[in-house]
Amino acid sequence: MNSIYEKLTTCLASVREKTDFVPETAIVLGSGLGDYAEQIKIETTIDYKDIKGFPTSTVPGHKGRFVFGYVDSVPVVIMQGRVHYYEGYPITDVVLPTRLMGMMGAKKLILTNAAGGLNTDFNPGDFMLISDHIATAIPSPLIGANIDELGERFPDMSEVYSRRMREIVKEKADKLGIKLREGVYVQLTGPQYETPAEVRMCKILGGDAVGMSTACEALAARHMGLEVCGISCITNLAAGLSDKKLNHKEVQETADRVAKQFTELITAVV
């Protein structure tokens, strides 16, 4: 058995020792957005540290647990905190939680993140619906022997982010009166914030927002056949686009400011 898949089955067995909950939708909460998990009807929670072989997040604002429950009548599993490539994990560990949620039964994945705005029309506090991504700065989670149990060797990526789900998000945002941007997300490695020169490069490539997560998870999810939706909370303007120095505290403060709108939007979309 492929060692990566073996690790996944070990993690799944560990989860199943604690709950037999089968989610329909999986949700990953980004920096500063983790409180959404407290708003649902919670059935049970599992700390990452209690799952054998599971990587744990070291980032402030990431609690590090799965929350199982219901948004209205929809069964969901929520990642309250994610692991990042910059924490030193191999990329296969970074996407292990995504794959695990798919193996739990999830058919849809909603990815959220805190991101820097590259598009000068964007403002801190805006939400950006991800239409596509650029992930060439990070290794693909599909490198290595293909895990046939998960998906095919050469998966199509012409529509990573579901057009159907994007239309739903737009419709719900419009009904809620939430201003929604749309654009291309660029994933860089971090943990350092981008230099002004890197920001210029990302803009030339066609990026509208930049961050340190999400794209690799979307790739792994699409490989498994999950329907993917991505939403960025623009928490700051990228380096060189304003006079402010970038810091994680600002990211969390901006996310806190728009938390109510975020909760309304995600609940409506689910």
Annotate each predicted stretch with a short phrase.
Residues 107-108, 208, 227:
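Short acidic/polar active-site loop segments enriched in Thr and Asp
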Residues 239-270:
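His/Asp/Glu-rich mid-to-C-terminal helical/loop segments that flank catalytic regions of hydrolases
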Residues 14, 18, 164, 168-178, ...:
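Generic non-transmembrane alpha-helical segments
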Residues 1-157:
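Metabolite-binding pocket within alpha/beta catalytic cores that recognizes anionic/polar moieties
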Residues 102-105, 203, 222:
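Non-catalytic positions within long, well-ordered alpha-helices that form the structural scaffold/packing
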Residues 212-250:
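Zn-dependent metallopeptidase/amidohydrolase metal-coordination segment
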Residues 172-208, 266:
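Active-site/ligand-binding-proximal alpha/beta "capping" segment
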